[in-house]
UniProtKB/Swiss-Prot annotation:
One of its GO terms (biological process) is translation. It comes from Pyrococcus abyssi (strain GE5 / Orsay). Belongs to the universal ribosomal protein uS4 family. SUPFAM superfamilies: Alpha-L RNA-binding motif. Part of the 30S ribosomal subunit. Contacts protein S5. The interaction surface between S4 and S5 is involved in control of translational fidelity. The keyword RNA-binding applies. Residues 103-174 form the S4 RNA-binding domain. Transmembrane segments: none annotated. The keyword rRNA-binding applies. This is Small ribosomal subunit protein uS4. Disulfide bonds: none annotated. One of the primary rRNA binding proteins, it binds directly to 16S rRNA where it nucleates assembly of the body of the 30S subunit. PANTHER family: 30S 40S RIBOSOMAL PROTEIN, 40S RIBOSOMAL PROTEIN S9. Signal peptide: none annotated.
């Protein structure tokens, strides 16, 4: 019904383009989490800003509706694995960008040992070799829910699903070499 809504940017750019401290901090995060470009980082920073902004507004608000929204925000962040189960609204204000970047599918695939490097994890996801909860996800920036974390595997249709795949054997060998 009607026209589709206007597409809007999902991120805010920094207010000043050449602040050295911010550029250095962004470069470290880009390298550590193997992000494609700054826009990916800015999207997650904007998401974090929005969570924190909502928390500040809800801390000041009173009433039934504010209480409902508090519970909804906390439930969402707990479902995403960003907050522990016993968290309160003040804990939202202490979230960092690293907390969100740790919940990306790309990071979790690497940490679970399904890929040798962050870059390989990104490639496996984009090429459709990774599935979450039986669904192939092709977005490395997908934020994995806490209950989905255990369901991340190689896709059934992927050659990587075969334990005898040469690349998979190299990943296993690298895992054993790291443990020894």
């Amino acid at each position: 019904m009607g026209d589709p809504k206007r597409q809007r940017k999902k991120y805010e750019t920094p207010p000043h383009p050449w602040i050295k401290e911010r550029l250095d901090r962004e470069r470290v995060l880009m390298d550590k989490y193997e992000l494609k470009n700054k826009k990916e980082l800015w999207k997650h920073e904007t998401q974090l800003k929005n969570f924190r902004r909502r928390a500040r507004r809800l801390l000041a608000a009173r009433g039934k509706q504010a209480e409902i929204e508090r519970e909804q925000l906390l439930a969402r962040l707990k479902r995403l694995g960003l907050l522990p189960e016993d968290a309160v609204l003040d804990d939202v204000l202490s979230l960092t960008i690293e907390d969100i970047l740790e919940r990306r599918l790309q990071t979790i695939v690497y940490k679970k040992g399904l890929a040798r490097t962050m870059r390989q994890a990104r490639q496996l996801i984009v090429h459709g070799h990774i599935e979450v909860n039986g669904q192939i996800i092709r977005s490395p920036s997908y934020l994995v829910l806490k209950e989905e974390e255990d369901t991340i595997t190689y896709a059934r249709t992927s050659p990587f699903a075969n334990p005898q795949h040469p690349e998979r054997m190299m990943i296993e060998k690298a895992k054993q070499g790291g443990e020894a």
